[in-house]
């Protein structure tokens, strides 16, 4: 698997004095069931045993073991929701 951290995400992490992120496929409950929701957070996960570790552009990226991708790669980026920037992961298959 190839993991990249784009320029926007690197700037976001530098602004928040972070050098690592972790990502997994979470879920959002709705009336119709659970909708898969890829998630990414700054920092390190509580249990490193559950994650594979990658380094991209000086950023440590922890990816939950068993994560499936659409094309063999994940990209950590930043999206803007209303006026707030937040980390996002692209390329997870679900």
Specify the residue positions occupied by each region the protein language model found:
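Domain-level signature for proteins that mediate thiol-based redox and metal-cofactor handling
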Residues: 1-94
């Amino acid at each position: 698997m190839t993991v990249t951290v784009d320029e926007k995400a690197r700037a976001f992490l530098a602004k928040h004095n972070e050098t690592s992120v972790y990502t997994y496929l979470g879920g959002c409950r709705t009336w119709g069931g659970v909708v898969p929701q890829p998630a990414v957070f700054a920092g390190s996960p509580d249990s490193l045993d559950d994650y594979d570790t990658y380094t991209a552009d000086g950023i440590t990226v922890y990816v939950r073991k068993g994560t499936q991708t659409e094309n063999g790669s994940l990209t950590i980026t930043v999206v803007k929701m209303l006026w707030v920037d937040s980390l996002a992961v692209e390329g997870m298959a679900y």
